[in-house]
A protein has these predicted regions:
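Alpha4 helix (beta4-alpha4-beta5 surface) of REC/receiver domains from two-component response regulators
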Residues: 62, 82-100, 107, 111-114
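Conserved phosphotransfer cores of two-component systems
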Residues: 42-44, 66-74, 89-94
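Acidic catalytic/metal-coordinating carboxylates
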Residues: 33-36, 59-63
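Receiver (REC) domain active-site loop signature in two-component systems and cognate sites
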Residues: 55
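Active-site beta3 strand of CheY-like receiver
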Residues: 45-50
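Conserved acidic carboxylate
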Residues: 8
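Two-component/phosphorelay signaling modules centered on CheY-like receiver
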Residues: 11-29, 116
Length: 119
């Protein structure tokens, strides 16, 4: 299956999503903020970046810009619980696959990941 980097500052959500995606057969790695996520992207090869938008150190918008510049083929799926953050992601339409609204149910994030990987 796919190798997915999950970048989310909320520990419980990050590990919850990682466990669910591993049950689907994906390999997952985790990062707690955008800077750590970018470092992991530079050290590995990933099929998908699944990132929260609102995080400390480096937010998901900046991470998406830098990740897409360094890795043009990388698929990016963002998550947010804030409407204004979703609007900020509109500028990334050419760089990301979609934005998933939080809170979400497990079937929702699994479907979003499957769609992103198929895109």
């Amino acid at each position: 299956m796919a190798k997915i980097l999950i970048t989310e500052d909320e520990d419980s959500l990050r590990s919850f999503v990682a466990r669910a995606l591993r049950l689907d057969g994906h390999e997952t790695e985790e990062a707690a903020d955008g800077a750590e996520g970018l470092e992991k992207l530079r050290d590995g090869v990933y099929d998908l970046l699944l990132s929260d938008i609102r995080m400390p150190v480096m937010d998901g918008i900046e991470l998406a810009h830098q990740a897409k510049s360094a890795f043009p083929a990388l698929k990016i799926l963002l998550m947010t619980g804030y409407a204004e953050q979703r609007e900020r992601a509109d500028d990334l339409a050419e760089k990301i696959v979609d934005v998933v609204s939080k809170p979400f149910a497990l079937p929702d994030i699994r479907k979003a990941v499957a769609r992103a990987l198929a895109a």
